[in-house]
Amino acid sequence: PYITWNGALIVYEGATSDHGDNRPDLSGKLKAITAGHGDALAYYKDQTYRASTFNDLVKAQYDTFNTPYPKVDPDYYLTHPVYMLLVITVNNDKRYIYPYGDQLTFYRNSPYAMDTIRHGESKQAGIKTLIAKMGLDGIPTYAFGDGTNDLPMLEYVDHAIAMGNGITAAKDRAEYITSKNTENGIIQGLQHFNLLP
C-alpha cells in the first residue's frame, strides 16, 4: 500500500481510493488561466505526468527537482484520471487561489509551482484513510516531511521527522530532524527510531 500525490492517491490491494481525480471542469478552468498568463499546468496520474505546454517555467520547475520534463498533452485531463495538478507559476498565485481556494488546496513547494489537490485532501487525510482501510487503528505512526504540504501530516502522526533540508515550520513540528534528503535522511531517520538496523 502507498499514498502519493499529497494524499490524493491511495493504493491498497491493487485498488485506488475514493480520493483524487480532480474534476475535469476545474482542470480546464485552471488550464485557461495558465494559458492567459504564460504559466503552465501539469497533470499527475499514478506514475504518469503531462503538461499543458512547455515553456521556461516548466523547464525551471523540473530542473529544480532534477526530474524528467513532462510530455505535452494539453487535454490529458479529459481522458485520464488526474490526482494532482501542478500550477506552474511564479507570480500569479492569487489568480488561482482566489477563484478556486474553496474547491482546491494549493501548496507552494517550489519557487516555480504550487501542488494542487482537491480541497480536504492531504497526506494526513490519506494516512487516516489507509489506516482505517487496513484496520490498523492505534498503531504508531511515523512521517517524514520537508515542505508546506507536509505540515498537517507532521502534526497528526505520533513521530514527526523533518528532513534537514526542510522548511522551518516542518522542523518546528518535528520530534526528530534527520539529515537532508540527498544525504540519506530517510534511512537515518528510520534508524534513529529503530525501524531499520
Question: Where does each model-flagged region fall?
Answer:
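Alpha-helical substrate-recognition element adjacent to the catalytic core
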Residues: 1-14, 20-24
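Short hydrophobic/aromatic-enriched beta-strand-loop microsegments
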Residues: 1-5, 61-62, 106-109, 160-164, ...
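Short, polar loop motifs at secondary-structure junctions
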Residues: 7, 89-93, 164-168
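A short acidic, helix-capping loop that chelates divalent metal ions and anchors anionic groups
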Residues: 10-14, 115, 170
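Short loop segments at secondary-structure junctions
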Residues: 13-16, 90-92
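Short acidic-hydrophobic, aromatic-tinged amphipathic segments that line or gate anion-handling sites
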Residues: 20-21, 70-72, 177-180
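Conserved acidic, metal-coordinating active-site core of Asp-based
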Residues: 28-32, 36-144, 148-153
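Mg2+-dependent phosphoryl-transfer enzymes with acidic/Ser/Thr/Gly-rich catalytic loops
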Residues: 116-197
